[in-house]
Amino acid sequence: MNKKKVILSISGHDPSGGAGLQTDILTSNFFNLHCVSSLTCQTVQTTKKLFKLDPTKVKFFKQNIDHIIKSTNLSGIKIGVVPNRDIACEIIKIISSLKIPVVIDPIFFAGGGGKFTNKKDLSFLRDSFYPHSSILTPNIEAVSYTHLRAHETY
């Protein structure tokens, strides 16, 4: 029997179920992957509005990931919402040590409106965090913040 490959989803919690860890887990299951996760933030939001974002404490985030890494043979990492520079710096340390594929899906805004990342941290993400990805997959709204050029595919 083949064991499922394991991916680590590092993202936020969307209580409306439209994004974040919930959709990463669903997508992983669709592709017959086992998804383990670490929460970057919790949000209070609906499909129409982001009311509040509460970043995970860095110490807690680090402990969670350290235990996942020790107990799991990861095949890859998928990163979504990174709410601040502190979490980003911790993720950089982690992905630099693992040497596995990393997909970063930069998320700056909630679907219903509201920012996930402040302007100062956005510059850090663009200049120092995104270069650590194997693949960067911004949606069309996020492309301008990454300073990449969008290419249409038909």
Predicted regions located by residue number:
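A short acidic, helix-capping loop that chelates divalent metal ions and anchors anionic groups
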Residues: T43-F51, A110-K115, S144-Y145
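Glycine/small-residue-rich loop that forms an oxyanion/phosphate-binding "nest" at active or ligand-binding sites
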Residues: G76-I95, P101-D121
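A conserved, positively charged/aromatic
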Residues: F129-Y130
